[in-house]
Regions:
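Short, conserved "active-site rim" segments that organize catalytic pockets and cofactor/ligand binding
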Residues: 1-32
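Divalent metal-coordination and catalytic microenvironments
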Residues: 2, 26, 55, 144, ...
Length: 165
């Protein structure tokens, strides 16, 4: 299962060199975790026995940028629907504005993208009784990864199991 951003530059099938039908892909701006998306992950993991969920974010994510813009200049979004995405991203990035990262926009965006990926992965791990049971009972793994638009490389950095000795 891949929960990814709706950005057209990050099609999971191409990123992971898979054919159509090989992946269960769920896409939404900023890979925000809302109830319908959790239900989709639960469906794939429970019904099809999928044992890996990848939360795939990417560099320069527009949803993260929109959230940072809103936090820096409140009142920018006139769309309640876009505001709902910003509101889901906000908790994972707003504390970064109180750090020295606020002085370096590129570093802030890089860390905010990763914080949002971590938050989405954590929400899946701990925000669903079904997924929690699958993690405990069946070895489901939820990992966070970032796709670099610049290099085409995916870096797995959150929730990656330690290699067996």
């Amino acid at each position: 299962v891949v929960l990814g951003c709706s950005d057209s530059r990050v099609p999971a099938e191409i990123v992971f060199d898979q054919g159509l039908g090989d992946l269960f892909v769920i896409r939404v701006a900023g890979h925000v975790v809302a109830p319908s998306l959790v239900g989709s992950v639960e469906f794939a993991a429970d019904r099809f026995g999928t044992r890996l969920v990848v939360v795939l974010g990417h560099s320069r994510c527009g949803a993260v940028l929109a959230t940072l813009d809103e936090l820096e200049r409140p009142g920018g979004s006139r769309s309640p629907n876009l505001a709902s995405i910003v509101d889901r991203v906000r908790p994972s990035v707003e504390t970064l504005l109180a750090t020295e990262l606020r002085e370096d926009r590129d570093a802030l965006v890089r860390e905010a993208v990763r914080a949002n990926i971590r938050a989405s992965a954590d929400h899946l791990r701990h925000g669903s009784r079904v997924l929690e049971e699958l993690i405990q009972r069946d070895g489901l793994v939820v990992v966070g990864a970032e796709y670099s638009l610049e290099t085409g490389v995916v870096e797995f950095f959150d929730g990656v199991p330690e290699p067996s000795p």
